[in-house]
């Protein structure tokens, strides 16, 4: 009986230690991030390799895969096996980028497009019309970004 109790006590200590190590290292930082981004702890997120695309490039049309108009610095092409279409994504590395209208990017993108080369943990960010539109986002090309699903949208993404 004592051996069983000792084994049970040891098991509970090991279990508690494993759960403690799984807890967040920075709960206050996690809370601040969730308030700033609107995402809840445990929201699905992915580390993705980014590429850029623009109108005028081969194979790029004026409409996304939903039939909606592509929106500069908002439309993201994704692999729907990884990230579902109609997902609102927060990409923290894009916060502060210059938008086509001169405003500052808030980090929100709309997963409304797909691409033949977008497979797995890749994301293609639409920058606008012409190769010059890629300049503000050039540093993101081939970079590893963090995309977090923070919601879903209906219809077409806002312009």
Task: Please give the residue ranges for each predicted region.
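Sec/Tat signal peptide C-region and signal peptidase I cleavage site
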Residues: 18-22
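Bacterial N-terminal signal peptides
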Residues: 8-16
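Solvent-exposed, well-ordered loop and adjacent helix/strand elements within mature globular domains
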Residues: 23-159
